Amino acid sequence: SSTPGAPGRGRGTPARSRYLLAVLLVVAVIAASLAWVVSSPVGSSPDEDFHVGSMWCPPPVDETGCQISTKDGEKAVMVPQSLAKEYVTCYAFDHDNSAQCALNASDEELAPTLRWDDGNYPWGYYQFAHLFVQHSTNRAVLALRAFNALLAIGLLGAIIALADSGLRRAISVALTVAWLPMGFYFIAGMNPSSWAMTGTFAFAAALLASTRSEGRRRVGLVACALAGAVLACTSRGDSAFFLFVITVALAFAVPLSRRIVPEACLACVASAAGIWVMSRTNVAASHLASGSNVSGESWWHIMYLNVSALPDYLRGFVGYLFGPGWNDVSYQGTVSSGASLVVVALLAWSLRSLSWRRVL
């Protein structure tokens, strides 16, 4: 009686091993992400003084209860002193000064800041981030960072779990290679780029995977794609536009048939919404850090700015001319070269199955 049961136990062992491995992998990813969350102080990412100011006083500031003031003759909002630019960035570009200088500011006292969102970003992210506002500015920012990291893990993990085995491996490899090192740095931050990157990747991966799935898996993947589109459209104008770019790419990657009508409808609606969102923002992605305002420009010009910024944007993922902090921490050398080598090796390996459809 024990003999017939032995094969069953043998067949179950690989499944249990895979399940245990998946659980350990998820735990490791969560632990690594939370380590990124607490590894840097408030104000440590590009324009974070702008983002924390917008988090405390989301637009429209006249209706959110924020105190309005003036600074240097310009309209300003009142935020905790610890979030004012002179304190939250006191260590930026100063390699001889640690972030301890930020502790000299108080969470109790208020200070005016000119760094707040006045139409530069779509509605959604800052309004949601405002829900994390509390007495301690450090805890508020860390809580938002942790949420953004767990959101990415949950959404992208669901897509990987629902995708077919072949695509599951491809998505996992692409995600890891493309986002190391800079991608994970932003995902585990409070910058709207966290939602933008999670959303655009989720939209592309889930939509592609859904065209190759059936039943509940397909429904789940379409739902993940929709969630990604919402994140992209509520975080940045450029990520909203990239939904259109992704749709065009998928049109070449997936053969057109009646079967993919639901995915095609979602892609078209998301693309139209993304273009509309981008046209209503005041600042193109490549110009926020430099302070170049393109308010009043046509949406065609804004579209051109976003597309022309793509090469530098992609090179930045491997740390080329781009690093943590306010881009004042260099990844040039081992990190950038190593990441570039991995990307080139992966591209060379992928050429084995290249087709004209994929080239287009």
Where are these regions (language model features)?
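Short acidic/glycine- and proline-prone juxtamembrane loop motifs at membrane-interface regions
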Residues: 188-196
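Perimembrane helix-loop-helix junctions
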Residues: 209-214, 219, 223, 240-272
